[in-house]
Amino acid sequence: MEKVGVLLMNLGGPERITDVGPFLYNLFSDPEIIRLPVPAFQKPLAWLISTLRSTTSQQAYLSIGGGSPIRRITEQQARELQSKLRDKGLNVTTYIAMRYWHPFTESAIADMKADGVDQIVVLPLYPHFSISTSGSSFRELKKLRDSDSEFQKIPMRCVRSWFSQSGYLKSMVELISEQISLCESPDSAHIFFTAHGVPKSYVEEAGDPYKEQIEDCSLLIIDELEKYLGHTNPYTLSYQSRVGPVEWLKPYTEEVLTDLGKAKVNDLIVVPISFVGEHIETLQEIDIEYKEIAEKAGIVNFRRVKALNTHPTFIDGLSELVVSCLEGPIINIEKASELPEKVKLYPQEKWQWGWNNSSEVWNGRVAMIVFLILFIELISGSGPLHKLGIL
């Protein structure tokens, strides 16, 4: 029987406090996360940002137990999926490829080659495609495949996005309905989707389909939820986790929470729509930061829907995705990593970065000047930022 390797791709996360700095460095070294007009500055800037943000990020991870649970949860998902697929009669072994922390993609490739898999199904644990999530992981996998003649011999099929998959939608509906059932007035409970944001330029200039897929997904979930419950609930979609001075997708989660409080919303059902497992954005950002904002705004009942993790219906859905991928038309790594025609992702491809095209030159100059000032101050150990207590 053909031996199939199912490669689950995910973000990764620091497992210990000491991992936070290196994890952030890996994250910001990715040109699909931060784009610079001068590629040579990518790694120095990644070092600078990770150095500046480490302490704050470490405090966030301490508030959820000292590390990210993303590896543990992804390993549980992999085991459950492997078991489900073997129950279907498939000779499947699951592997994990994290983008920014262990186990890295290189490790998964080595394991698959050592195990002698005959075919690979690549399944990103991101329901919605984005340049900075699935796109980055696909492109990293393609780069490694292109440089490995032995790896190239193994046939590969990819799942690009799967936000409309029935098992995924059903599992979301089941978890949302659990929280709605706890409300005194289930019909009026407000469904609050919060998705991880991306810079607005990703969508408007780079052609990232992420925003459209998130919006379509929220409508599909609401439609299925109405069929399941027999009534319609009001809902809102927002975007969280923005960083830096550039404009991200709107509306911002923290601002919408304040508006909903002013609108006298009592029962809020918070749905982390772009996350399939618990991690820092759900456990700390939503459960602590956003809950505090909501309570200050006057929202009485803040109920957060659990992440999918190993919810049985979700695992069933993932298994159906793998089977469909094996039986359906082939989407190879070249097609999966393909970006919209108008995307110009890297600095050498001259995609303008910043707030708008006309500000490209000045944004680049200002960024480089700020970078050099910060770099000199970090090396010298003195300067205005030290006097202000920032460094």
From Swiss-Prot:
Entry-linked InterPro entries: Ferrochelatase (IPR001015), Ferrochelatase_AS (IPR019772), Ferrochelatase_C (IPR033644), Ferrochelatase_N (IPR033659)
What are its GO cellular component terms? cytoplasm
Coiled-coil segments: none
Q: Name one GO molecular function term.
A: metal ion binding
Among its keywords, does the record have Ion transport? no
Known EC number(s)? Answer: 4.98.1.1
The record lists Fe cation as bound by 196, 281
The record's subcellular location field reads: Cytoplasm
Entry's Gene Ontology BP terms: heme biosynthetic process
Which reaction(s) does the protein catalyse, per the Swiss-Prot or TrEMBL entry?
heme b + 2 H(+) = protoporphyrin IX + Fe(2+)
Q: What class of enzyme is it?
A: lyase
Q: Which UniProt keywords apply?
A: Cytoplasm, Heme biosynthesis, Iron, Lyase, Metal-binding, Porphyrin biosynthesis
Q: In which pathway does it act?
A: Porphyrin-containing compound metabolism; protoheme biosynthesis; protoheme from protoporphyrin-IX: step 1/1
Similarity field: Belongs to the ferrochelatase family.
- Role played: Catalyzes the ferrous insertion into protoporphyrin IX.
What's the name of the protein? Ferrochelatase
Species of origin reads Prochlorococcus marinus subsp. pastoris (strain CCMP1986 / NIES-2087 / MED4)
